[in-house]
């Protein structure tokens, strides 16, 4: 895969820890039970800003996030991808953008693992794989695990990206994310980032992260029916981008 950037990111006074500006985006919908723990566990010396994008929560999630110091943006329109895009549009000139769920299934304390390949200049996009770290087997039901592996296998086959999972804990250089012109408003957004990144020749690196049972009920994949629907949608998106890849290129940063 062609390398789009060379060398590590240059420090520019972003924070005390690494000198790089890091924005963390957390989509939420009724995550009052978990959001406090998520925000408390983020390494404050590595993070420049935290943006919680809330979609019509009725349990006080936005107020809790504000009390913890996060910037809260209300996004009434539904869609996981839409929430991520809204957060991205409201970042304040970051070098790196991290995406993290608000249910405490991922461990925010593992942020250094996600950031390292980008900070060190080895990657443009980093994906957290839930299949190689210290994960609780009960966190991913068999149908969700199977669907993720199937989609990841199709991406490997069609695009040559060494990926084993489509997990939500991920990061990207801000200039790369802007260049990809992401637009998917649903949970297909996770696939869009990988596929467009691969087509453009950006360096995509996967790292192992921990994964535990979420706090609260899953909005998408808690049932076999929900997982099948999500998997079918994601697989169709993977194939669609493959069919379109010869018609138009994806812009790259200068």
What do these predicted ranges mean?
Residues 161, 185, 195-212:
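Catalytic donor-sugar/metal-binding loop of nucleotide-sugar-dependent glycosyltransferases
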Residues 94-105:
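Short beta-strand-to-loop acidic/aromatic patch adjacent to the donor-nucleotide binding site
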Residues 30-44:
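Short, well-formed alpha-helical segments that are part of the catalytic scaffolds
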Residues 76-78, 82-90, 108-187, 213-230, ...:
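Acceptor/aglycone-binding surface of glycosyltransferases and processive sugar-polymer synthases
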Residues 31-34, 57, 80, 107:
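Donor nucleotide-sugar binding loop of glycosyltransferases
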Residues 21-23, 49, 192:
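Cell-envelope/extracellular polymer assembly enzymes that use nucleotide-activated donors
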Residues 54-62:
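A conserved acidic beta->alpha catalytic loop
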């Amino acid at each position: 895969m062609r390398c789009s950037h060379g060398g590590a990111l240059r420090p520019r006074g972003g924070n005390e820890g690494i000198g790089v500006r890091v924005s963390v985006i957390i989509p939420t919908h009724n995550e009052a039970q978990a959001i406090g723990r998520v925000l408390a566990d983020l390494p404050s010396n590595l993070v420049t800003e935290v943006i919680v994008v809330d979609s019509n929560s009725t349990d006080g999630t936005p107020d809790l996030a504000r009390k913890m110091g996060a910037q809260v943006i209300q996004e009434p329109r539904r869609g996981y991808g839409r929430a991520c895009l809204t957060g991205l549009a409201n970042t304040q000139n970051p070098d790196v953008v991290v995406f993290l769920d608000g249910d405490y299934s991922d461990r925010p304390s593992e942020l250094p693992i996600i950031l390292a390949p980008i900070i060190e200049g080895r990657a443009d996009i980093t994906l957290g794989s839930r299949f190689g770290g210290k994960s609780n087997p009960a966190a991913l039901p068999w149908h969700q695990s199977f669907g993720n592996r199937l989609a990841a296998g199709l991406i490997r086959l069609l695009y040559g990206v060494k990926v084993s999972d489509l997990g939500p804990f991920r990061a990207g250089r801000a200039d790369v994310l802007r260049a990809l012109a992401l637009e998917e408003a649903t949970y297909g957004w996770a696939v869009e980032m990988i596929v467009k990144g691969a087509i453009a020749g950006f360096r995509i690196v996967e790292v192992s992260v921990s994964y535990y049972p979420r706090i609260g009920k899953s909005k998408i994949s808690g049932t076999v029916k929900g997982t099948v629907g999500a998997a079918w949608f994601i697989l169709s998106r993977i194939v669609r981008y493959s069919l379109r890849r010869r018609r138009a290129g994806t812009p790259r940063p200068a």
